[in-house]
Amino acid sequence: MNGYKEIPVTYMRGGTSKGAYLLQDTLPTDPAARDRMILDLYGSPDVRQINGIGGADPLTSKVAIVNPSDRDDADIDYTFGYVGIADAVVDYEGNCGNISAGAGVFAIMEGFVKAVEPETVVRIFNTNTNKVIEAHVPVRDGKPVIDGDFAIDGVPGTGARITLYFLEPGGSKTGKLLPTGNVQDTITLADGRTIQVSLVDAANPAVFVKATDLGYEGTELPAFTETDGGVLLNTLEDIRTTAAVMMGLAPSKEAASPAVPKVCMVSAPQTYVASDGRTIEGNSIDIVARTKALAVMHKAYAVTGGICTATAALITGTVANEVVSERAKETNRVTLAHPSGKFDFEICLTHDEGWHVEKAGVARTARPIMKGIAYVKGE
């Protein structure tokens, strides 16, 4: 096709996200040319992404770039990117845990890892954070098992359980679990208010604030922001960009990445109604949390953000620790409640000479949707 280049694409859901899984050796080696190709594939910049495969939603405008790894401790190298919707940018600052779940399945599908029954462990080196993730993928007849009876909130139906272990997730971007060395810091908002926050870096950096300190219950659903005149989103973005500077991730608020750090609003366990109308009982959860997905509120919750939230909740003295259940503190298992429901984390946390996270575990599902050829503008 004149003017266009053919590239192989696998389109896959990973957790509560969705995106294209691309082979690194089929993309331009020049980063700028590579990003132009990815933007063209997704139909960006355009709020509808009508001329590409993007779904006009931050949770479906994601990309994974994968290749076999030369590292002794990894089978594949995996780079995650947020593909801008209205903006012509691909942001590689942080990782996506949901898309990571699909990376393990993709590696087996492509033959990068020998399929071992009944479970294949895929060692994934995430280039965004320079951390290794183990994906435990069920296998049958030499192929990943997709069907199963494991359900995750935010995705209809059930699938095969894929367990992810994020190894040594602390200091993913800043080099420190507590980037400022403090369990709490004070920041001043643009409107002059001062609030307490906690800055934590585990799997991805995040800043935590109590919902009650901002005047909210913490159980608000994403649709709430459509009627409040942008107050909540603007306040959270003010907190997020201020934290980016404090964590050394940006020289100024204006220069902060749109994706990193995460900003998370936390509150104590309480009963609420999820987006699908189900009642989430307060006694079944350990913490309630809400987070942003770029310029909107997340419809569920980021896996890496969840790992950071669960970790923060178990570090004595953080704002998240002040609202998490006593049960979680005793077991190091955290059930986090989000707009679409809840999910569970297991955090191996020690405090011998400072706080240290050995690994963090979470379960997801993934589903390959399509594998074929995409047409993108050639250069």
Residue spans of the language-model regions?
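A glycine-rich beta-to-alpha transition motif near the start of alpha/beta enzyme domains, typified by
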Residues: 1-379
